[in-house]
Curated annotation (Swiss-Prot):
Gene of this entry: atpC
Lineage: Bacteria, Bacillati, Cyanobacteriota, Cyanophyceae, Synechococcales
HAMAP family, alphabetized: ATP_synth_epsil_bac
Protein name, as recorded: ATP synthase epsilon chain
Source organism per UniProt: Synechococcus elongatus (strain ATCC 33912 / PCC 7942 / FACHB-805)
Subcellular location per the Swiss-Prot or TrEMBL entry: Cellular thylakoid membrane
Cellular-component GO terms for this entry: plasma membrane-derived thylakoid membrane; proton-transporting ATP synthase complex
UniProt keyword terms in alphabetical order: ATP synthesis, CF(1), Hydrogen ion transport, Ion transport, Membrane, Thylakoid, Transport
Subunit organization: F-type ATPases have 2 components, CF(1) - the catalytic core - and CF(0) - the membrane proton channel. CF(1) has five subunits: alpha(3), beta(3), gamma(1), delta(1), epsilon(1). CF(0) has three main subunits: a, b and c.
Keyword Ion transport: yes
Family: Belongs to the ATPase epsilon chain family.
Matching PANTHER family: ATP SYNTHASE DELTA/EPSILON CHAIN, ATP SYNTHASE EPSILON CHAIN, CHLOROPLASTIC
Function: Produces ATP from ADP in the presence of a proton gradient across the membrane.
UniProt membrane topology term: Peripheral membrane protein
């Protein structure tokens, strides 16, 4: 038994294929989905969605969204997504380093700047993790 997994961004379908397992970056932590999972609707955070298909893991950087699980179908609607195998690792490292420096340089009383820098940092971290260049932070 397997899952049917669809990852859909506003501009394209990122993934649509059978899988044995999915790990979602929910707003409350990592959420593992296996065949036979109970129906579920969950908000997603910025992070890495992982899909196990044909004994291989595929990482997808996602920037928030929602996931629905029902009858062995996992439908993931995301604000933006990028497959890890399509991300240039060196570019992702440079973007992460730049976002980290920007976050460190924001003044403590600059709430809007801090928010924007934090969002950029989280996006860059998710992309780097999906590309395989960062295990954990």
């Amino acid at each position: 038994m397997s899952l049917t997994v669809r990852v859909i961004a506003p501009d394209r379908t990122v993934w649509d294929a059978p899988a044995q397992e999915v790990i979602l970056p929910s707003t409350t932590g990592q959420l593992g989905i296996l065949p036979g999972h109970a129906p579920l609707l969950s908000a997603l955070d910025t992070g890495v969605l992982r899909v196990r298909a044909d004994k291989e893991w595929l990482a997808i950087a996602v920037l928030g969204g929602f996931a629905e699980v029902e009858n062995n179908e996992v439908t993931v609607l995301v604000n933006a997504a990028e497959r890890g195998d399509k991300i240039d690792l060196e570019e992702a490292r440079a973007a992460f380093s730049q976002a980290d420096e920007r976050l460190k340089g924001v003044k403590e009383d600059d709430r809007q700047g801090k928010f924007q820098a934090t969002q950029a940092y989280r996006r860059a971290r998710a992309r780097l993790q999906a590309a395989g260049g960062l295990v954990s932070v």
